[in-house]
């Protein structure tokens, strides 16, 4: 039987095949897709009994979730589903299947809907109680029933902010990832298909998106470049971080966009793919740097729980701050970077974006369990999670916005009270000159002026030159590099062996300086993973950053030292915490509007879990923002 509109209930219309792997369906005011392959089929014993049920959305109730199948219990369970699952709706109530393992194999009963007045009032026309022959793989939840088969249902959400590179679903039988690209929508599965969270699957049912620098098994990686995607082969396995997250139960729903080769670019400089739209304020703000897609997806869509990104020199902190969400840059080396497109082996690490400190803490703690020596922390009960030192580098950042400075001051006062210690206002440049790691008595702005730039350029050369050679060999032409990357490669070719050796020495000196002189966390008295000292400063752009600004042509290379480079240069964990909003006059709308204010907190290398545990407890105690809203404003 082929499903067509006349055979469906009045509120359902089949829209045909969208891309060869799912059918698009309208249920009332919502769009859905069903899996092409069924997750279960009825045995011949049951087909005649169910023959009167045409292609239809349906609900499945398993005895484990509702043992007695009483009408009141079924209605109560369904009501609960509506609160926890954005796929389930009343439209699925038309047909109800009760899977009862106590029934003799091959037996089933078409029950009177009058015995289920609550379900009847919800629109149920068929209630079938049956043995579980061949249906053991079904979980309670919403499905699409067609030709004696049950299909998973995915709710289709528009990608209104152009954050996604592709939508991804995982075949529930084979485990194969299936990609739909290009896409203007994302289809997400019911959360009810995932088992309850437990010790083996602590992230079960959480939906996430991946920056398209991380490999996904069976799919190609673009790294933000059409030429790179063209040359790429489907990957034999997923990147380590993707493997770990899915093994913990998280559900991958798509890849999100990034700048070409994950380099810093302004919105007008994106060429191969369209820059995502930051939803905050007037809607015309810069989403900021290479992980823009990851941050935009999280700041825009309530149906997405978290996203992963990569960081070379600010690609976690910058978009998290610009979009007012929680972001964590993991300690460099805390997680294997295997299967990720890498710019600099000295700087690159992974990161996580969420709207909730609880989800950030949960995902990070489970992700880092048993991954590396740096990522392995002792139990929190055995380490120091309240910092003994709060550093405020007041002279090292701009003071362009009074609301931002006042907000960060209130935030630090609350930290002082919570930690029972006063801030240490530190001039990092003065401390550097006093410590004099190089023995030159020079300013940090002079000694480290080229360090970050050379680290970035050397890594960029090492990543792009082999790609260009392989592309020319395959296609007998050069791959496309946008203007930013073309200029960057010119500079990268000028980096000498001496420059490389010097930058590695300088990075090591700064990392030691940051730990011993700034955080004062390397005295040997604390357990691995303990906090010791933290440094706090405002990270948000203190003025509007409009996406239609026409930037001058630059390679986006940082020929300077900046406090914002502390985490990548010293390999520290960095968490971005939304703390408020500042008012501005939008030149787009001509009206007053608001943008996020965020604080940056860094801790010692390897203290990722302890740092998040501290931030979570602090926000709870001081009634800070535990979560932010998606959309125009954070609160």
Briefly describe each language-model feature range.
Residues 201-347, 537-554:
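Short glycine/serine-rich loop/turn segments
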Residues 284-306, 344-345, 349-351, 462-486, ...:
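Electropositive, surface-exposed helix/loop patches at the edges of structured domains
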Residues 243, 361, 501-504, 612:
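Generic structural signal for individual residues within well-ordered alpha-helical segments
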Residues 199-203, 246, 298-300, 384, ...:
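Extracellular/periplasmic catalytic domains that process cell-envelope and extracellular macromolecules
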Residues 2-18, 306-405, 409, 414-417, ...:
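Structural helix-boundary/capping segments
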Residues 1-201, 369-561, 630-635:
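Amidase signature
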Residues 239-242, 294, 412, 515, ...:
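Short amphipathic alpha-helical segments and helix-helix/interface helices
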Residues 197-200, 230, 237-243, 525-526, ...:
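Beta-strand elements of modular eukaryotic interaction domains
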């Amino acid at each position: 039987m082929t499903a067509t509109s006349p055979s469906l209930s009045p509120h359902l219309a089949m829209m045909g095949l969208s891309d060869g792997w799912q059918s698009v369906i309208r249920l009332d005011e919502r769009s859905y897709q069903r899996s092409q392959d069924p997750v279960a089929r009825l045995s011949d014993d049951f087909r005649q009994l169910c023959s009167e049920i045409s292609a239809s959305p349906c609900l499945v109730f398993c005895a484990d979730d509702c043992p007695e199948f009483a009408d009141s219990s079924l209605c109560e369970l369904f009501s609960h589903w509506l609160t926890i699952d954005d796929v389930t709706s009343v439209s699925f109530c038309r047909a109800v299947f009760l899977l009862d393992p106590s029934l003799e194999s091959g037996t089933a009963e078409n029950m009177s809907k009058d015995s289920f007045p609550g379900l009847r009032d919800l629109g149920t026309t068929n209630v079938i109680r049956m043995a579980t022959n061949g249906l053991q793989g079904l979980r309670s939840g919403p499905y699409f029933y067609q030709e004696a088969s049950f299909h998973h249902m995915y709710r289709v959400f528009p990608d209104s902010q152009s954050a996604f590179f592709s939508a991804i679903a995982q075949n529930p039988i084979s485990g194969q990832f299936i990609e739909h690209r290009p896409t203007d929508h994302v289809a997400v599965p019911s959360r009810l298909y995932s088992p309850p969270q437990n010790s083996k699957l602590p992230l079960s049912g959480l939906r996430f998106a991946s920056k398209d620098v991380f490999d996904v098994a069976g799919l190609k990686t673009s790294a933000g470049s059409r030429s790179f995607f063209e040359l790429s082969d489907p990957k034999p396995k997923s990147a380590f971080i993707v493997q770990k997250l899915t093994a913990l139960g998280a559900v991958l729903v798509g890849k999100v966009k990034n700048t070409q080769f994950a380099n810093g670019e302004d919105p007008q400089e994106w060429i191969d793919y369209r820059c995502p739209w930051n939803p905050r304020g007037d809607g015309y703000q810069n989403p900021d740097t290479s992980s823009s897609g990851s941050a935009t997806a999280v700041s825009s869509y309530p149906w997405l729980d978290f996203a992963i990104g990569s960081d070379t020199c600010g690609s976690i902190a910058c978009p998290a701050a610009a979009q007012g969400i929680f972001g964590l840059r993991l300690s460099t080396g805390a997680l294997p970077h295997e299967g990720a497109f890498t710019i600099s082996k000295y700087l690159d690490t992974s990161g996580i974006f969420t709207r909730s400190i609880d989800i950030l803490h949960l995902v990070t703690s489970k992700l880092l369990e048993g991954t590396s020596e740096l990522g392995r922390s002792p139990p929190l009960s055995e380490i120091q999670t309240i910092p003994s030192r709060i550093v405020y580098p007041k002279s090292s950042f701009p003071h362009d916005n009074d609301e931002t400075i006042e907000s960060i001051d209130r935030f630090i006062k609350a930290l002082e009270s919570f930690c029972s210690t006063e801030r240490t206002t530190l001039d990092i440049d003065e401390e550097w000159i006093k410590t004099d790691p190089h023995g030159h008595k020079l300013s940090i702005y002079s000694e480290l002026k080229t360090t970050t730039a050379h680290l970035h350029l050397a890594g960029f050369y090492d990543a792009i030159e082999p790609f260009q050679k392989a592309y020319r060999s395959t296609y007998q032409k050069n791959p496309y590099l946008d203007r930013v990357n073309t200029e960057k490669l010119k500079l990268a070719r000028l980096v000498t062996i001496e420059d490389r050796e010097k930058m590695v020495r300088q990075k090591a000196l700064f990392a030691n300086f940051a730990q011993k002189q700034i955080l004062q966390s390397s005295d040997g008295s604390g357990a691995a993973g303990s906090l010791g000292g933290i440094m706090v400063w405002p990270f948000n752009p203190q003025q509007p950053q409009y996406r239609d600004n026409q930037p001058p042509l630059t390679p986006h290379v940082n020929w300077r030292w900046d406090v914002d480079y502390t985490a990548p240069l010293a390999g520290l964990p960095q968490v971005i915490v939304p703390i408020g909003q500042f008012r501005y006059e939008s030149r787009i709308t001509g009206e007053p509007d608001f943008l996020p204010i965020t604080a940056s907190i860094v801790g010692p290398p390897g203290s990722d879990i302890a740092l998040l545990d501290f931030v979570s407890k602090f926000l709870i105690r001081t009634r800070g923002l535990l979560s932010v809203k998606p959309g125009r404003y954070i609160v």
